């Protein structure tokens, strides 16, 4: 029972630029309503009582973060991020060396629901490995021919999931797996892939498909719609 009461720290890698958004401003600083995407993402984490600290890894040349109210928030720590996501996450983990469990959440994923976060955090009661929020694949999936815009074959979707964030792991285990994977030149696309590389099998915790990452211009309007809908539902 005590495991469910442990405080949790979160790491938010926010040093990327997001060139697919086709904007001069990094996507995490684009606004939805009266807040930036980064603020929406961080506030969703801090809304849960177990999340007591959020470490945000930003680019060393970032001048935008200091202009946000987040810069003066007592539960937020800022560190310099790296060139790659894994480097930024490791920098964040160094800042919470005493934490037992850590969340890692995308800076540009502002639509996290509190019930999803609560279900993910609950796995710390019985898991030594952790897990991720994920959404079952619903569309028909095709694998393309290498180097061609042509279908190679249809991929069976029965056991396919979209990996989402937050992802939630024991801090020491995540640190060790990320370090080993990077040192051995493994391709790491998210934190779970580092654990997979080291032979672990994180849990899949089903989350809502509207927990989208803002990656392309059309995602911004969709995220705004989802956030507005959630606010209206909470007020109802």
Curated annotation (Swiss-Prot):
The yes or no answer to whether the keyword Ribosomal protein is present is no
Q: In which pathway does it act?
A: Isoprenoid biosynthesis; isopentenyl diphosphate biosynthesis via DXP pathway; isopentenyl diphosphate from 1-deoxy-D-xylulose 5-phosphate: step 2/6
Q: Where is this site: Transition state stabilizer?
A: 20, 27
Q: What class of enzyme is it?
A: transferase
| UniProt key word Nucleotide-binding | no
Q: How does it assemble?
A: Homodimer.
> What does the UniProt function comment say about this protein?
Catalyzes the formation of 4-diphosphocytidyl-2-C-methyl-D-erythritol from CTP and 2-C-methyl-D-erythritol 4-phosphate (MEP).
- Recorded protein name is 2-C-methyl-D-erythritol 4-phosphate cytidylyltransferase
Its organism's taxonomic lineage begins at: Bacteria, Pseudomonadati, Pseudomonadota, Gammaproteobacteria, Enterobacterales
- The gene name reads ispD
């Amino acid at each position: 029972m005590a495991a469910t009461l442990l405080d949790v720290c979160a790491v938010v890698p926010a040093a990327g630029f997001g060139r697919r958004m086709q904007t001069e401003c990094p996507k995490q600083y684009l606004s939805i309503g009266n807040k930036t995407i980064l603020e929406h993402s961080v506030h969703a984490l801090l809304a849960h009582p177990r999340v007591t600290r959020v470490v945000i890894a930003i680019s060393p040349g970032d001048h935008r973060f200091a202009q946000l109210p987040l810069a003066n928030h007592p539960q937020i720590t800022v560190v310099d991020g790296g060139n790659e996501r894994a480097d930024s996450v490791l920098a964040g983990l160094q800042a919470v060396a005493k934490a037992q469990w850590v969340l890692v959440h995308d800076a540009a994923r502002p639509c996290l629901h509190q019930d999803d976060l609560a279900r993910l955090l609950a796995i710390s009661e019985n898991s030594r490995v952790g897990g991720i929020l994920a959404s079952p694949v619903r569309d028909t999936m095709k694998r393309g021919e290498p180097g061609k815009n042509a279908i190679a074959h249809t991929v069976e979707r029965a056991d396919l999931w979209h990996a989402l964030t937050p992802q939630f792991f024991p801090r020491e285990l995540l640190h060790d797996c990320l370090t080993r994977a990077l040192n051995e030149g493994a391709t790491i696309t998210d934190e779970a892939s580092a654990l997979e590389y080291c032979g672990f099998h994180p849990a899949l915790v089903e989350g809502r498909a509207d927990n989208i990452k803002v990656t392309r211009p059309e995602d911004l309007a969709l995220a705004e719609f989802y956030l507005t809908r959630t606010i209206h539902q909470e007020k109802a």
